Design a protein with these regions (language model features):
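Short, flexible loop/turn elements at secondary-structure junctions
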Residues: 40, 77-79, 137
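Mg2+-dependent endonuclease catalytic cores in nucleic-acid-processing enzymes, primarily RNase H-like
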Residues: 2-15, 43, 88-216
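Short hydrophobic beta-strand segments
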Residues: 72-74, 187-190, 245
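Acidic two-metal-ion nuclease catalytic site recognized across multiple nuclease folds
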Residues: 104, 229-256
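Charged alpha-helix within mobile-element recombinases
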Residues: 212-235
Length: 256
């Protein structure tokens, strides 16, 4: 037997005991192969091979945030079987319509903590228009609670529930495949200075997002990708329009 395929008799890291390794290999075989057998994903396996084209050094997110551009947030909430929440904040250049991620927050927060994090986002980004929050049933209680306590959550009127589904994810224009088109056309400006130089297993919001987008759909985690998509949906619905193209020379994007 190829020794690479064997599970170690003694786990190399207590965070991944033998039983967890076996479960990971059974439930996420491609992710296991990438993470524990060092078999890299090919471009044909990735949904977003053009993502690195958007990496732009020298962008200071604080400067972008202070420009007063329309800002949108997507929120992927934890569920009964999945811990962790992600808040993804994007500013949109009203002239070129290019999208600039300016803040990515991750945390294992309870409902009041999620609300507090959103309040902080609303305070830091006064031009925040919409907070698009995933709603698959379990999260509805949080959404209702935020809207029913406007005194405590003064951003309540900006919260909109978004229901995900397979058809939404695979739609070539509005779903995740459409995001690859936007990456290819450099409609997103990714501030690479936020994560370049970080250690390989850095768990900051930026590094986790870059890994998840790079490995999607084969990676074990996808929370940041979905929060990114919810922010994109907020832009499409309440922003300046849907991106349909951008010239290689940097011309303004069209809308429809």
């Amino acid at each position: 037997m190829n020794p690479v395929m064997k599970l170690p008799s003694v786990p190399v890291w207590s965070h991944w005991p033998t039983e967890r390794l076996r479960e990971e290999k059974e439930t996420n075989p491609r992710s296991y192969s990438r993470g524990f057998e060092q078999r890299a994903f090919s471009d044909s396996e990735r949904m977003f091979p053009s993502f690195p084209l958007c990496f732009t050094p020298g962008i200071v997110t604080g400067d972008i945030a202070r420009r007063g551009w329309p800002t949108f947030a997507g929120v992927d909430l934890s569920g009964p079987k999945r811990r962790g929440n992600v808040i993804f904040v994007v500013a949109v250049d009203p002239l070129s319509q290019r999208r600039y991620p300016i803040e990515i927050l991750r945390g294992d927060w309870k409902s009041p903590e999620v609300a507090a994090q959103l309040a902080g986002v609303n305070t830091r980004h006064p031009n925040l228009r919409i907070i698009m929050v995933e709603n698959n049933g379990y999260q509805q209680a949080l959404i209702d609670w935020i809207k029913q306590t406007p005194g405590e959550n003064q951003y309540w009127f900006k919260v909109e529930a978004y229901t995900t589904g397979f058809e939404t994810k695979v739609n070539p224009t509005y779903g995740l495949p459409g995001l690859e088109v936007e990456f290819k056309n450099k409609a997103w400006v990714v501030p690479s200075s936020e994560f370049e130089g970080h250690p390989p297993h850095c768990s900051c919001g930026w590094c986790v997002w870059v890994r998840e987008v790079t490995d999607y759909p084969m990676g074990a985690e996808q929370d940041s990708v979905m929060a990114h998509q919810f922010a994109r949906e907020a832009i499409s619905k309440w922003g300046t329009g849907i991106t349909v193209g951008v010239a290689q020379g940097g011309a303004s994007l069209g809308t429809r």
